[in-house]
């Protein structure tokens, strides 16, 4: 996999992120190289490979119906809201994959709380996060790539994944084999294979000088033995077939290898001579520059000593004035502290005085105002009227009660007389 060939270690990422910003006020910021601006693209590509190793397409994207991010999704600004939501979703999923319980963020959650929780989980893994949380609100940038890459590393560690060294394919050389044929080995077995092993490049080369010597020796032996006139008894058709069979095996191919140092020897010598010639001229310029710098430094040193000697009394006066200034500042700080305390006491006394004045004004206004007396008189008049009305009602009720009693008494007397008269009449009969 491509991620195995270009692995960015977490410590390297942390150093890169820490070098990209100052650690505090007054601290020197380390300048980065010209390629540091493109470092987050490399980190983002490694992050995509690690997410593929974690099978995020099946376990995250399809379940949440999300679109797979591009190889530079978090490195370039496209849609901040969508990128921030994707960042929070990926971070929560990676934290869960790393063995830590983490709730999946929702759209209505507070972004600051989500970022704070993610950074606290990142620090719990032992990773550094010394950048402001506002860097993650945009949803893109090197800090977003750094956080996701660290969480992906922790998730891979938790599942037991380890990076292996890349295995480069070995180029196999085509071995040219020559089939042995006992019918053709008539003279001293001239078709022997001579192979010379080269320990530098681990490849086999055929020694052409040996083949040439063998051919020359074969010709000499044949010329010595064949003194009489030879008569050919070979069939032309069989000879053609044999030539066609042996011809591919007689081809000697020597392949050039770019790794062989012999090809670059001439170029190395040319570069060496060029460097030596340039070094002679450059060395003279550098020697002259060194001498000039040395003389200038000596002049600067002597001038500095002269200035120090001339301004020594002024430096002493300056130090004395500096000491007096520090004492005056200290007295000023003490006096300023006393003034502040007295100002606070004055404000408290003024506040109490305002309260007393307000109370006095309220009491004076209540004493001089005649409105309460008028209200009391009106209430008394109203009470008298209500008393008169009540007396009248009581008299009416008493009169009505007396009339009812008299009427009841008269009715009772009439009833009594009515009952007595009939009894006397009955007695006369």
Curated annotation (Swiss-Prot):
Recite the UniProt keywords alphabetically. Apoptosis, Cell projection, Cilium, Coiled coil, Cytoplasm, Cytoskeleton, DNA-binding, Transcription, Transcription regulation
A single GO cellular-component term from the record reads: photoreceptor connecting cilium
Tell me where on the tree of life, at the top rank, the source sits.
Eukaryota
Keyword check for Transcription: yes
Where does it localize?
Cell projection, Cilium; Cytoplasm, Cytoskeleton, Cilium basal body
Spell out the coiled coil positions from the record.
Answer: 305-369
* Chain residue ranges for the region called pDED: 335-426
Q: Membrane spanning segments where?
A: none
List the Pfam families: IFT57
Q: Which GO terms describe its biological process?
A: apoptotic process; intraciliary transport; non-motile cilium assembly; regulation of apoptotic process
According to the UniProt record, where is the region Disordered? 1-26
What does UniProt note about where in the body, tissue by tissue, this protein is expressed?
In retina, detected in the photoreceptor basal body and connecting cilium. Most abundant in the inner segment of photoreceptors (at protein level).
Gene Ontology molecular functions = DNA binding
**Entry's family note:** Belongs to the IFT57 family.
Q: How does it assemble?
A: Component of the IFT complex B, at least composed of IFT20, IFT22, IFT25, IFT27, IFT46, IFT52, TRAF3IP1/IFT54, IFT57, IFT74, IFT80, IFT81, and IFT88. Interacts with IFT20. Interacts with IFT88. Interacts with IFT80, IFT-81, IFT74, IFT172, IFT70B and KIF17. Interacts with BLOC1S2. Interacts with RYBP. Interacts with HOMER1; the interaction possibly prevents the pro-apoptotic effects of IFT57. Interacts with HIP1. In normal conditions, it poorly interacts with HIP1, HIP1 being strongly associated with HTT.
Function description: Required for the formation of cilia. Plays an indirect role in sonic hedgehog signaling, cilia being required for all activity of the hedgehog pathway. Has pro-apoptotic function via its interaction with HIP1, leading to recruit caspase-8 (CASP8) and trigger apoptosis. Has the ability to bind DNA sequence motif 5'-AAAGACATG-3' present in the promoter of caspase genes such as CASP1, CASP8 and CASP10, suggesting that it may act as a transcription regulator; however the relevance of such function remains unclear.
Q: What is known of its domains?
A: The pseudo DED region (pDED) mediates the interaction with HIP1.
Quote the protein name from its UniProt record: Intraflagellar transport protein 57 homolog
């Amino acid at each position: 996999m491509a991620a195995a060939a270009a692995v960015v270690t977490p410590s390297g990422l942390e150093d890169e992120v820490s070098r990209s910003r100052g650690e505090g006020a007054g601290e020197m910021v380390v300048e980065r190289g010209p390629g540091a601006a493109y470092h987050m693209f490399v980190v983002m590509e490694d992050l995509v490979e690690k997410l593929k190793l974690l099978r995020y397409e099946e376990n995250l994207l399809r379940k949440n119906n999300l679109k797979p991010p591009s190889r530079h999704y978090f490195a370039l600004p496209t849609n901040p809201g969508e990128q921030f939501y994707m960042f929070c979703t990926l971070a929560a999923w990676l934290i869960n994959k790393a063995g830590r319980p983490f709730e999946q963020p929702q759209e209505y959650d507070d972004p600051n709380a989500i970022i704070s929780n993610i950074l606290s989980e990142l620090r719990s893994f032992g990773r550094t996060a010394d950048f402001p949380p506002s860097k993650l609100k945009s949803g893109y940038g090197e800090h977003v790539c750094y956080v996701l890459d660290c969480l992906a590393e922790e998730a891979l560690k938790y599942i037991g994944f380890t990076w292996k060294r890349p295995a480069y394919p070995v180029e196999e050389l085509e071995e040219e084999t020559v089939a042995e044929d006992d019918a053709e080995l008539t003279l001293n077995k001239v078709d022997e294979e001579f192979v010379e092993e080269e320990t530098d490049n681990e490849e086999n080369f055929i020694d052409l000088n040996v083949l040439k010597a063998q051919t020359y020796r074969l010709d000499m032996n044949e010329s010595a033995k064949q003194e009489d006139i030879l008569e050919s008894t070979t069939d032309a058709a069989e000879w053609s077939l044999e030539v066609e069979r042996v011809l591919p095996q007689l081809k000697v191919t020597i392949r050039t290898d770019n790794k062989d140092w012999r090809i670059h020897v001439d170029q190395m010598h040319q570069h060496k001579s060029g460097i030596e010639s340039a070094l002679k001229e450059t060395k003279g310029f550098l020697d002259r520059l060194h001498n000039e710098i040395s003389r200038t430094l000596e002049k600067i040193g002597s001038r500095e000593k002269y200035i120090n000697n001339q301004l020594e009394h002024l430096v002493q006066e300056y130090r004395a004035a500096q000491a007096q200034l520090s004492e005056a500042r200290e007295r000023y700080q003490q006096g300023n502290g006393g003034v502040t305390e007295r100002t606070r006491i004055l404000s408290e006394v003024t506040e109490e005085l305002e309260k007393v004045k307000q109370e006095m004004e309220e009491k004076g206004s209540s004493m001089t105002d005649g409105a309460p007396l008028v209200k009391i008189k009106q209430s008394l008049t109203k009470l008298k009227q209500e008393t008169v009305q009540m007396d009248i009602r009581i008299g009416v009720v008493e009169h009505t009660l007396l009339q009812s009693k008299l009427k009841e008494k008269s009715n009772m007397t009439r009833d009594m007389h009515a009952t007595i008269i009939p009894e006397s009449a009955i007695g006369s009969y």
